[in-house]
């Protein structure tokens, strides 16, 4: 699915790709290396492609899978015996943000993964770094990416409930930081596999979107086209024969309810927002 997505994006002339977490199944070293190998066919890391950490990419103890090779990596500082192939191999230390400038737009990637659970959190240190970055230029047009959704609406409407998203205290603090920076216009999430646009808990300046999964149903990618008068969001289903066959098979997960739970409304997948971006 990832190979098919990159081929389509390359054919469309897309120059930058952002993978918003869950790049692997369980962050096994072989999985991380294979992900990087596939992505490097598109371009150079930190230049043509960027990745945040999802819950599946979190550190693991060697006894989680004795044959995976976790024990070849050093013990993660501050943990009993967790190893972090994702962080080591991709140069993404746990709970550290990254920033890249794409034309007039600043893109900030957050690590919202917990050490051992599927829900999300943001460390005090990462919050401090985010606040400093936003305050450095609060009016700069900014996109923020984090694997876990952060709105109450996202928590109460996803199948697993509020425990599945960013914890409530961190979600409130993150929304406040984004709301206090007038340049932040878009906050993208993954995790739920669905296409779903939700309202923030306060303020109306930030657009919160969960994008549909690539690896399974609904099987696609989301394009964000930013221009001086606003931006356009479009979800594209993968069109290769193998990708369509897998998507058709994957739609029967969740007892056949995946289309109802994950595809979302047309307005969740395709829309335009008019605002000044300069």
What is each of the regions a protein language model found here?
Residues 25-28, 58-62, 116-118, 151-154, ...:
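Short catalytic/ligand-binding loop motif for oxyanion handling, primarily in non-cytosolic enzymes
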Residues 29, 33-136, 165, 169, ...:
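Extended active-site neighborhood of metal-dependent phosphoesterases/phosphodiesterases
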């Amino acid at each position: 699915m990832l190979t098919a997505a990159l081929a389509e994006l390359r054919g469309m002339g897309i120059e930058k790709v952002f993978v918003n977490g869950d790049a692997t199944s369980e962050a096994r070293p072989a999985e991380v290396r294979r992900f990087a190998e596939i992505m490097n066919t598109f371009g150079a890391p930190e230049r043509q492609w960027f990745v945040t950490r999802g819950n599946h990419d979190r550190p693991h103890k060697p006894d989680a899978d004795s044959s995976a090779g976790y024990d070849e990596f050093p013990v993660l500082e501050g943990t009993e015996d967790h190893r972090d192939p994702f962080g080591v191999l991709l140069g993404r230390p746990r709970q550290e943000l990254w920033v890249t400038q794409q034309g007039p737009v600043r893109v900030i990637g957050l690590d919202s993964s917990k050490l051992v659970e599927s829900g999300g959190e943001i460390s005090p240190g990462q919050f401090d770094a985010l606040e400093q970055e936003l305050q450095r230029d609060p009016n700069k047009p900014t996109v923020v990416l984090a694997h876990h959704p952060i709105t109450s609406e996202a928590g109460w409407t996803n199948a697993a409930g509020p425990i599945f998203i960013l914890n409530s205290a961190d979600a409130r603090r993150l929304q406040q930081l984004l709301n206090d920076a007038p340049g932040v216009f878009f906050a993208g999430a993954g995790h739920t596999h669905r296409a779903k646009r939700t309202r923030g808990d306060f303020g109306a300046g930030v657009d919160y979107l969960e994008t549909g999964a690539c690896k399974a149903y609904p099987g696609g990618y989301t394009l964000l086209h930013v221009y001086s008068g606003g931006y356009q969001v479009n979800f594209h289903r993968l069109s290769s024969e193998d990708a369509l066959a897998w998507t058709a098979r994957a739609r029967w997960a969740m007892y056949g309810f995946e289309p109802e739970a994950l595809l979302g409304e047309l307005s969740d997948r395709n829309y335009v927002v008019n605002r000044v971006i300069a």
